[in-house]
């Protein structure tokens, strides 16, 4: 895989999505990039071993709620995810919190427009999962 400038890719994706460039601060490509959202958990973007992950921690109480909403959540995951490698989102536990993750398919890393598709898609899933877990 050729060198990926994740900071520039994220900046471009945010601009393509309509974010005012003056609202985008300095982005450090050497650490996890965190996009703070209103009324939703932050979206994190990180690179590990040349793979790009988009993820969000859904909250400490989410593990308990997961037991109550497992069927609904599983059905959402089984719908598939076009921008994720393997076509599936992942749920895991990280630091005691339920975490929604997507390993971004390389086809969505070539430019800001394609990455914005992945980023916006993840945002939409985050809304669905947050709504399910916060009911």
Swiss-Prot record:
One Pfam assignment: Invas_SpaK
**Gene3D superfamilies for the chain:** 3.30.1460.10
The cross-references to CDD domains, in alphabetical order and at most eight, read: T3SC_IB_Spa15-like (cd17035)
Give the transmembrane ranges.
none
Matching SUPFAM superfamilies = Type III secretory system chaperone-like (SSF69635)
Among InterPro entries, the record links this protein to: Invas_SpaK
What does the subunit comment say?
Answer: Homodimer.
Keywords, sorted A to Z: Chaperone, Virulence
Instruction: Give the function comment from the record.
Output: Involved in a secretory pathway responsible for the surface presentation of determinants needed for the entry of Salmonella species into mammalian cells. Chaperone specialized in the storage of effectors within the bacterial cytoplasm, maintaining them in a secretion-competent state, and allowing their immediate delivery to target cells upon contact of the bacterium with the host cells. Has been shown to chaperone SopA, SopE, SopE2 and SipA.
Q: Identify its protein family.
A: Belongs to the SpaK family.
Name of the molecule in the record: Surface presentation of antigens protein SpaK
């Amino acid at each position: 895989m050729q060198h990926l400038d994740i900071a520039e890719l994220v900046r471009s994706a945010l601009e393509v999505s309509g974010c005012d460039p003056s609202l985008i601060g300095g982005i450090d490509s050497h650490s996890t990039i965190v996009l703070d959202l209103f009324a939703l958990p932050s979206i994190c973007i990180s690179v590990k071993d040349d793979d790009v992950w988009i993820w969000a921690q859904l909250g400490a109480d989410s593990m308990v709620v997961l037991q109550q909403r497992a069927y609904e959540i599983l059905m959402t995951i089984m719908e598939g995810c076009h921008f994720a490698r393997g076509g599936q989102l992942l749920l895991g536990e990280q630091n005691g919190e339920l975490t929604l993750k997507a390993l971004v398919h390389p086809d969505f890393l070539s430019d800001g427009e394609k990455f914005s598709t992945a980023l916006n898609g993840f945002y939409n899933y985050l809304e669905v999962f947050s709504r399910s877990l916060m009911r």
